[in-house]
Amino acid sequence: WQRHTHITKLKMSKQEQKDEHKQTDGSPEVKAKIRRMQMESSANAARQQAALEDVPNATAIITNPTHFAVALQYDVGSSNAPKILAMGRGKIAEMIIERGNESKITIFQSPLLARALFFSGDIGAEIPEMLYQAVAVVLAYIYRVDRGENLERPDIELPKDMRFDEFGRQLAMGTGGYDA
């Protein structure tokens, strides 16, 4: 009888079995969240890759000089806001810049604006309303330079909550008023 009692005590309860399974294989909720994030990342990368075909239709490309690139399209006289045709970071950004150069599209370097557009906008959508003023300044500058005017590069002022670092974290309120 002593032996039988000892063996029974060694057996795991159903809850202990579940807990051990979660410890060794990970909880189903965490695994599902990881799978969902991987799927979203993959879909986003596919959208960025497909958007590269639209770069030749861009009005301007805003860059950070190599890490981020956002291709914008704006029709003068249109009542619509500028639209994001393509955007990417790293290799995709390099490809956007390369295609922009091939298509003779004006490239404007503005790290803060490029990151703001990247982290707050979506491919195929209009730019966020909070960035209208900054993008308008850039597009006006580009149109005038493309017409042959010799202008000084404008300072781009962004709303405080639209300033991001390269990881998408908002910058502290006191970090620079103009383009960094």
Q: What are these regions, as identified by a protein language model?
A:
Residues 1-88, 93-97, 107, 111-119, ...:
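N-terminal cationic and glycine-rich segments that engage phosphates or anionic surfaces
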